[in-house]
């Protein structure tokens, strides 16, 4: 089963009769708040916006709709719709009631001097802490920037299977590349999904190579809605979220 499908099905089981109270599609992030007060975030791929007067082909407002309806947007190829679906799922899944491990993801990972590490998405604050501790750190982005030692995503096919540790941006769930990336990490000792868009749910990832989920739990919904509406990113809302980690466990099954 595709991971997006499993994520949709799992979140729909929690949605019940919950409805969308508020939604903001910002330049950097998308926020969805449910009528129980819970809020979820997901990255906005602004460069995927097309011309026209509306993001969605509808004359109806989104606020007030059932959460289950927004989760069905996981079936869409539209990256903005996918972000709305993931933000809705995160509002349902990223609850403060779980037993999380606090702190940065890098503190939860054991690196060795001979490790080759693949990082999908340039998490620049983590690079300085990882590169001196390992043999090689490969950074992959949609656009290669060789002057900054950043490789194109096509190079993951060759290099990711050689890595012992993989750090994958959760935006791969939004753009649909997550399944292929996980298939390339089947031999990794540790696979971490990280970023603000990360859905914190063991059930979704328990049959994949993923060993750790690193994301956020909203603690000030009003502040987050304001920041997203104003086009702000992670520096602007870091006081309104808790950065947490959820341990999945060792990889016991290959990802199919």
Regions found by a protein language model. Give the residues of each.
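A short acidic, amphipathic alpha-helical/loop segment
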Residues: 129-130, 177-184, 204
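A short helix->loop->beta-strand "cap" motif at the edges of active sites that frequently abuts
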Residues: 134-135, 186-190, 210
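Electropositive, gly/pro-rich neighborhoods at or near active sites that engage anionic ligands
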Residues: 1-131, 228, 244-256
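Conserved acidic E/D residue at the C-terminus of a beta-strand in Rossmann-like folds
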Residues: 121, 140-143, 195
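Short acidic low-complexity segments
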Residues: 103-108, 150-162
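Structural motif
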Residues: 118, 165-169, 192
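C-terminal functional extensions of proteins
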Residues: 192-256
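NAD(P)-binding Rossmann-fold cofactor-contacting core
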Residues: 134-147
């Amino acid at each position: 089963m595709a991971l997006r499908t499993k994520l949709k099905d799992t979140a729909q089981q929690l949605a019940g009769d919950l409805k969308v109270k508020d939604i903001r599609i910002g330049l950097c992030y998308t926020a969805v708040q449910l009528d129980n007060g819970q809020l979820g975030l997901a990255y906005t791929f602004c460069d995927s916006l097309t011309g026209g007067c509306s993001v969605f082909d509808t004359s109806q407002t989104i606020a007030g709709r059932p959460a289950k309806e927004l989760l069905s947007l996981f079936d869409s190829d539209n990256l903005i719709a996918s972000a709305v679906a993931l933000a809705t799922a995160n509002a349902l899944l990223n609850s403060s009631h779980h037993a999380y491990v606090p702190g940065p993801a890098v503190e939860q990972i054991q690196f060795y001097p001979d490790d080759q590490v693949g990082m999908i998405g340039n998490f620049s604050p983590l690079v300085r802490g990882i590169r001196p501790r390992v043999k090689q750190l490969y950074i992959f982005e949609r656009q290669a920037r060789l002057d900054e030692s950043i490789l194109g995503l096509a190079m993951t096919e060759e290099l990711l299977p050689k890595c012992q540790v993989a750090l994958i941006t959760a935006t791969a769930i939004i753009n649909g590349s997550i399944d292929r990336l996980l298939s390339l990490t089947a031999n990794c000792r540790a696979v971490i999904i990280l970023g603000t868009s990360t859905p914190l749910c063991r059930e979704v990832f328990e049959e994949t190579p993923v060993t750790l989920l690193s994301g956020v739990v909203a603690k000030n919904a009003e502040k987050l809605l304001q920041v997203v509406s104003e086009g702000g990113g992670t520096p602007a809302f870091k006081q309104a979220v808790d950065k947490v980690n959820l341990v999945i466990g060792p990889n016991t099954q290959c990802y199919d």
